[in-house]
């Protein structure tokens, strides 16, 4: 869409918290591109907002751009920062690989645990157009995710240790809010990293 996971999404979904998130997801992911800027524009028109500050990170998780926009330029600025963010996304060296090993996933990295623009796996079709892996192995969750396992469903293999670190209550709340119970699926798990990696390789 014109804007994605930036200032407009924070306004349209984030400020309304659980209610806003539930309402948006009930409309369907395919409506996000149209609805997010529309709802953000309505909010900005009716609320006392001074400005918006957008932050872009690079492929090394470092802040690479900070820009402030006046109220009437926030949506336009969000689109501008989206183009910058896309240019600075991390890229795989190969377009097609057998096994992708992800050390950690978490909500602090991406709403889907790992950025689907990088991994090629997400809730919407199209991410696999630029990168494809036959099997994905997720080792663990990030500490800041506090056990929220959102995104683990995209993995083919994980470990028992990873599943034992999951806070199932917060994870189920996340899935029920976004109306995607399929996102709660659990990948095949093994007792150790070695066994998980061996299984991923053997089943390519």
Q: What does each model-found stretch correspond to?
A:
Residues 117-121, 125-204:
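C-terminal non-catalytic interaction/assembly regions of soluble proteins
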Residues 2-106, 129-131:
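Conserved, well-structured core segments that form the ligand-binding/active-site neighborhood
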Residues 110:
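Hard-cation-handling environments
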């Amino acid at each position: 869409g014109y804007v994605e996971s930036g200032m407009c999404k924070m306004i349209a979904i984030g400020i309304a918290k659980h209610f806003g998130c539930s309402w948006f997801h009930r409309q369907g992911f395919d409506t996000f591109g149209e609805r997010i800027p529309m709802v953000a524009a309505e909010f900005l028109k009716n609320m006392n907002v001074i400005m918006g500050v957008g932050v872009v990170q690079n492929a090394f998780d470092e802040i690479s751009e900070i820009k402030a926009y006046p109220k009437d330029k926030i949506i336009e600025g969000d689109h501008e920062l989206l183009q910058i963010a896309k240019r600075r996304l991390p890229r795989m060296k190969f377009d097609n690989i057998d096994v992708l090993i992800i050390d950690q996933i978490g909500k602090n990295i991406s709403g889907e645990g790992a950025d689907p623009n990088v991994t090629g796996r997400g809730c919407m079709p199209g991410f696999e157009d630029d990168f494809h892996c036959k099997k994905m192995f997720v080792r663990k969750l990030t500490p800041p995710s506090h056990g929220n396992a959102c995104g683990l469903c995209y993995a083919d293999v994980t470990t028992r240790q990873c599943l034992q670190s999951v806070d199932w209550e917060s994870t189920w709340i996340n899935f029920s809010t976004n109306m995607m119970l399929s996102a709660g699926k659990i990948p095949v798990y093994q007792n150790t990293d070695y066994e998980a990696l061996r299984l991923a390789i053997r089943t390519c």
